[in-house]
Amino acid sequence: MLTEHRPDGLLAAISLDFPDGHHLGRHFHPQAQFLYAARGLMRLATHHGAWVIPPTRAVWIPPRVEHEIFMSGEVHMRTLFIEQPETPTPLSDCCVLAVTPLLREMILRAIHLESQPRLDDFRQRLQGLILSEIANLERMPLYLPMPRDRRLQAICQALLKQPELGLTLDDWGLRVGASSRTLARLFAQELQMSFHEWRQQLRLTEALPRLLAGDSVQVVARDLGYGSTRAFSSMFRRLLGETPRDYLGRLEQLARIRGRED
């Protein structure tokens, strides 16, 4: 367990730093968990799929969801453990979220409160504000669901090993013994996305840690099967709202402004 949960049932916050390559094995918490990547990149895996959490983003984990976490680069993790609110939350499953500056400051405030005398009334109000802000955050397309159907499993496992493969559904159909129409239907039914969307999200989740590690946009685009840097940048912008260069430039600017994360 990462921390002892508060016996009074209020929000608990913790600040943890991890080296590159660190792995937190499978575990779960009775509370909902909000993991904020102040620095570095995290990969979250459950039985249902995988999520990538780049710097300045966060992931929501509902109570009692078994998961493991892999660190890429030096990771500064800021964690909130939150009792399920009495009112239903729209976040019923794991999801990656874009963190606002307001929420970031509230997270840091919650961590600071852990070392202060008991301020339960204030802590309770802060928890309500944090939950309200989390519920309205933008979801990021950084989730890679995994299928149950053996034919889809064969396709997805092959692409996980070689994300640059450009085979069509017709090509895959010949390999796994199903028509492209059947495979398209299965992707929509099991994964709630098309084959093309799944492959795009796979490539995005593969691209982010490499870009953050310093690989050039050109090399990453080539290695992931894109015919041009422009095509890769177009996909990146469509999914994340900015080009790879703008994304990396923004992170560098934030790092300069903040100096180091608290």
What role is predicted for each listed range?
Residues M1-V96:
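N-terminal regulatory/effector-sensing and dimerization cores
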Residues R150-A158, R199-E206:
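Pre-recognition alpha-helix immediately N-terminal to the DNA-recognition helix
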Residues S179, S194, G227, E242-R245:
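Short coil/turn motifs that cap or connect alpha-helices
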Residues A110-R118, E133-P141, I155-T168, F187, ...:
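Basic, amphipathic alpha-helical hairpins
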Residues T56, L183, F187, A231-F232, ...:
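Short hydrophobic/aromatic patch on the recognition helix
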Residues D170, Q189-T229, S233-S234, G249-D262:
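Terminal helix-turn-helix DNA-binding modules in bacterial transcription factors
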Residues T87-Q157:
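Amphipathic alpha-helical segments enriched in hydrophobic/aromatic residues interleaved with Lys/Arg
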